[in-house]
């Protein structure tokens, strides 16, 4: 029986979406292999589930491509100082999203909007977003999701310009609890518990520097994951 997906297929799909081909150092290949194997072995996915899982994996790789391109184009990102960041963390479904979005509404703070998490780049002026093709592509996907799953809007509202959790940046390293929150992946979970998170958070930090280039506001981030990987996050 042929595999449900291969790493090569996912890389090719991410390159087609972005027009980019430099994925950076291979510090994520082991995690990608573990995820592909665990989805196949453990998750018992339906055809629709396989489609969703492929899209999430492709999205993580596409975001990785955008980050690598951004770091090359804006080497000055490395000089951005992340001063006194705020981290919101806690158990899922306990109000952390509401608190995070409330804090991010302060003009002195900056959150991580969904479209910039999925396609990291220096944050453009907000009045240009509606004309940005990447923003429009991601917003169109959100609107389709609202139509197909209207009940989800009351659980966790999503829009391209809405502040989101920063675990999406950790997905670039294929080390994130988000995968196991959305599918039954016990073998991946067991592997994840043995991992050093330092490299994943180093990449996370570089992404925040890239996105925050040209601003001096306090970063406000949220993820239930930070409570279990706190030492690496610091």
State what each model feature region is.
Residues 1-73:
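Long, basic/Gly/Ser/Thr-rich N-terminal segments
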Residues 3, 46, 50, 92, ...:
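Aromatic-acidic/polar surface patches that form glycan- and anion
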Residues 87, 98, 207-210, 233-234:
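Short, hydrophobic/aromatic alpha-helical segments in well-folded domains
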Residues 105-115:
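Post-Walker A helix-loop "phosphate-sensing" segment adjacent to the P-loop in P-loop NTPases
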